[in-house]
A protein has these predicted regions:
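Eukaryote-biased RCC1-like beta-propeller repeat architecture
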Residues: 1-162
Length: 162
């Protein structure tokens, strides 16, 4: 379980991570299994060692930074709508439960921060790299183009003016 983390509100597209599209009128504990924070067939069943570091809520999706004591670094997981790739899983298929953003597992430095906005998400690593994904049709991801990205893309913030 995510200790102390609960979600409530509009459950459309699974944004609450509760396993359904139902709204939650009161704070409801998010059930989490080891599958939410690992990659492999052996990942199943509850993992009481998982700890939530941060939660970021977008318009119809949620991004979570998780720490699993059996892994060397924190992991990013997401749930909800992925109509523009805002979950970072490489497809437009939404999710009803948290699943890891696999493209971030190979970062050279651990992810230390996350954020979620309207149909977009981001992660920052300990070495200052920024990764963005989701809706980008107006260039709002800072990737140098005007298209959506379905997986995290590193953005060079040194190009940004002061």
């Amino acid at each position: 379980m995510l200790f102390g983390v609960r979600t409530w509100g509009k459950g459309e597209d699974g944004a609450l991570g509760l396993g359904s599209r139902e709204n939650a009128r009161v704070p409801t504990r998010v059930q989490l299994t080891s599958r939410s924070c690992s990659w492999g067939e052996e990942a199943s069943g509850p993992d009481m060692g998982l700890r939530c570091v941060k939660v970021a809520c977008g318009s119809n999706h949620t991004v979570v930074l998780l720490h699993n004591p059996s892994l060397p670094v924190a992991q990013v997981a997401s749930t909800g709508s992925s109509s523009y790739g805002q979950l970072g899983h490489g497809s437009c298929d939404g999710l009803l439960e948290l699943r890891p953003v696999r493209a971030l597992q190979d970062c050279k430095a651990p992810v230390t921060d996350i954020s979620a906005g309207h149909e977009a998400s981001s992660a920052t690593t300990a070495d200052g790299r920024h990764f963005l994904w989701g809706r980008g049709e107006w260039g709002q991801l800072g990737t140098g183009d005007e298209r959506s990205h379905w997986r995290p893309v590193a953005v060079d913030v040194s190009l940004m003016s002061d």
